[in-house]
């Protein structure tokens, strides 16, 4: 898998999969078996969706052939499974517009300015796009780009923090880990939370305590009420309210926010697709929506007898991939098996069975 730079010029795509959770990842696999290359878009900065974000360490017992695995473990297995098909990733981006074109293709644009012109679209958005909870304080939205980052991954956070005075805002394990990740690169690291208690595993909490005692990380208790900027929009300081209700000023160069994420249906409701109670209605033979070339799989769809299970989403993704392959071919295709089909084995990059 490889990231793709965003571009205002539409990139041609055989298929775009919206949502990089387990069902979206398996959709990429099934499309790959059909010879359909996929672009994969997700609002989160990493693949895995709800599994990786909300229950990475919780056991899952109902995946066929896997007696038990964690959410993160399942995501890692799926990443290995789709590796032969090298989907193009557009992470940290949300599809904000989708429109059918006169030639039957679908034009999609993302919040990062990426434009994709696709022959088919597979919506695997689960309960909606997981987007970071925003800081609600005066002046925050006007900050210059790059001075406030929501839920950046470790590499991005460390790179942005180099030589800077950094405030990490949040109280969960992601915030604690970000403070630990930045401590060697940053000029100063402060961990800001509304109280001096953090929800994290024992190991990172022990590291945090050791670095606090060494004076390398400072914990600040308070809530952001506003920001102070230079005339050019450069972030200079946070306005805080301490536990006693007194205003405080905290100078900084970079603000990293880890306030959790929440699912939002977002613009899907504006795409002209038939819906039933905020979910996409589908044909259960193909999992096509009301618009040709657009499919919906996983928790985002609804139909009689629907069960919101990962394994059901895998079944839906399989039928959707077969349906699109036949739509593009213009005729019914023979069923092939990975155990015996040299064509499928070649696509998977494995040696034919002897």
From Swiss-Prot:
Organism from which the protein derives: Acidovorax sp. (strain JS42)
Needed co-factor(s): FAD
Cited HAMAP family: FENR2
Cofactor note (record): Binds 1 FAD per subunit.
Reactions that this protein is recorded to catalyse: 2 reduced [2Fe-2S]-[ferredoxin] + NADP(+) + H(+) = 2 oxidized [2Fe-2S]-[ferredoxin] + NADPH
GO molecular function: ferredoxin-NADP+ reductase activity; flavin adenine dinucleotide binding; NADP binding
Keywords for this protein: FAD, Flavoprotein, NADP, Oxidoreductase
EC number(s) per entry: 1.18.1.2
Subunit structure: Homodimer.
Protein's UniProt name: Ferredoxin--NADP reductase
One Pfam family here: Pyr_redox_2
């Amino acid at each position: 898998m490889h990231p793709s730079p965003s571009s205002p010029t539409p990139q041609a795509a055989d298929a775009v999969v919206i949502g990089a959770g387990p069902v979206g990842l398996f959709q990429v696999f099934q499309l790959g078996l059909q010879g359909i290359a996929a672009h994969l878009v997700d609002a989160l900065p990493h693949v895995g969706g709800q599994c990786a974000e909300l229950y990475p360490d919780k056991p899952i017992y109902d995946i066929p052939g896997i007696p038990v695995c964690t959410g993160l473990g399942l995501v890692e297995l799926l990443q290995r499974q789709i590796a032969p098909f090298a989907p193009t990733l557009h992470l940290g981006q949300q599809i904000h517009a989708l429109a059918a074109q006169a030639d039957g293709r679908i034009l999609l644009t993302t919040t990062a300015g990426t434009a994709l012109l696709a022959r088919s679209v597979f919506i695997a958005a689960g309960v909606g796009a997981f987007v970071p909870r925003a800081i609600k304080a005066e002046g925050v939205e006007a900050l210059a780009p790059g001075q406030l980052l929501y839920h950046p991954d470790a590499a991005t956070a460390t790179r942005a923090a180099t030589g800077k005075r950094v405030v990490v805002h949040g109280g969960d394990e992601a915030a604690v880990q970000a403070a630990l990740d930045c401590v060697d690169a940053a000029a100063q690291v402060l961990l800001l939370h509304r109280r001096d208690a953090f929800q994290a595993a024992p190991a990172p909490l022990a590291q945090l305590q050791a670095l606090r005692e060494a004076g390398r990380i400072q914990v600040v208790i308070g809530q952001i009420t506003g920001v102070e900027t230079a005339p050019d929009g450069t972030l200079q300081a946070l306005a805080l309210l301490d536990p006693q209700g007194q205003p405080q000023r905290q100078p900084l160069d970079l603000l990293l926010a880890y306030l959790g994420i929440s699912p939002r249906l977002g613009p899907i409701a504006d795409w002209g697709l038939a819906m039933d109670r905020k979910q996409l209605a589908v044909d259960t033979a193909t999992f096509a929506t009301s618009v040709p070339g657009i499919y919906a799989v996983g928790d985002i769809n609804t139909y009689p007898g629907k069960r919101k299970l990962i394994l059901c989403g895998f079944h839906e993704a399989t039928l959707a991939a077969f349906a699109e392959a036949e739509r593009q071919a213009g005729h019914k295709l023979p069923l092939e098996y990975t155990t015996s089909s040299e064509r499928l084995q070649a696509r998977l990059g494995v040696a034919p069975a002897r």
